[in-house]
């Protein structure tokens, strides 16, 4: 059986933390900042964890990502 391949798009977007959780950046951060509040923009800078329902699917995409 051939080797599984890492999903390259997913690998660029998600990192694994030291404890094995999957860390991702937030959406809505590329443009249209004039109509977002300062508090909202500050919150968008923080990284977030992949939700529990998506963890299995994302982990499968990132087979070899450490």
From Swiss-Prot:
An annotated GO BP: translation
Biased composition (Basic residues): 1-26
A Pfam cross-reference name: Ribosomal_L35p
GO cellular component: cytosolic large ribosomal subunit
GO molecular function: structural constituent of ribosome
Keywords from the named record: Ribonucleoprotein, Ribosomal protein
UniProt-annotated stretches for the region Disordered: 1-28, 36-55
Entry-linked PANTHER family: 54S RIBOSOMAL PROTEIN BL35M, LARGE RIBOSOMAL SUBUNIT PROTEIN BL35M
Recorded family membership: Belongs to the bacterial ribosomal protein bL35 family.
NCBIfam families per record: rpmI_bact
Name of the featured protein: Large ribosomal subunit protein bL35
Organism field: Macrococcus caseolyticus (strain JCSC5402) (Macrococcoides caseolyticum)
Taxonomic placement: Bacteria, Bacillati, Bacillota, Bacilli, Bacillales
